[in-house]
Structure formats: C-alpha cells, structure tokens
C-alpha cells in the first residue's frame, strides 16, 4: 500500500479578514513581530503575509525606522 503524500497546510494572511489589525507605522508592537532579532524584515514565506500586505508592512517598518520608532539594526 502506497503512503499518503504529506501536504503542508497553507497559512492564512494575518492581515486579511474582518477583524484583522491595520498596518500602521505608529503601531510598533505589531511591527516588532515582523522584524527578526537582528532588526531585519522577516520574509512573507515565513510569516504567511500576502504580497500586498508584505509591501505595506515593509513600507510601515521603513517609515517607523526613519522616524526612530524602530531600530535599523540590533547589535
């Protein structure tokens, strides 16, 4: 009997849906979850964020960095 192939369950974008959080550069607690411990933006294949929302997220993180709300790099 052949083994059943393993299918990885597709993750759902955390920013889509009715009561999903809005991406805002002032919300540093939300943005902090999408930054690695070194200060880099985590890719969407890991966080399961859609392409459109990943672009919004990156823009918000860069804006927050420019305004010194988030660090550019962590030592």
From Swiss-Prot:
Entries under Gene3D superfamilies matching the protein: Ribosomal protein S18 (4.10.640.10)
GO BP terms, alphabetized: translation
GO MF term set: small ribosomal subunit rRNA binding; structural constituent of ribosome
rRNA-binding found in the keyword field: yes
Keywords assigned: Ribonucleoprotein, Ribosomal protein, RNA-binding, rRNA-binding
Single GO cellular component term: cytosolic small ribosomal subunit
Membrane spanning residue stretches: none
Record InterPro entries: Ribosomal_bS18 (IPR001648), Ribosomal_bS18_CS (IPR018275), Ribosomal_bS18_sf (IPR036870)
Function: Binds as a heterodimer with protein bS6 to the central domain of the 16S rRNA, where it helps stabilize the platform of the 30S subunit.
Family the entry assigns: Belongs to the bacterial ribosomal protein bS18 family.
Subunit annotation: Part of the 30S ribosomal subunit. Forms a tight heterodimer with protein bS6.
Name under which the protein is recorded: Small ribosomal subunit protein bS18
Phylogenetic lineage: Bacteria, Pseudomonadati, Pseudomonadota, Alphaproteobacteria, Rhodobacterales
Designated gene of the protein: rpsR
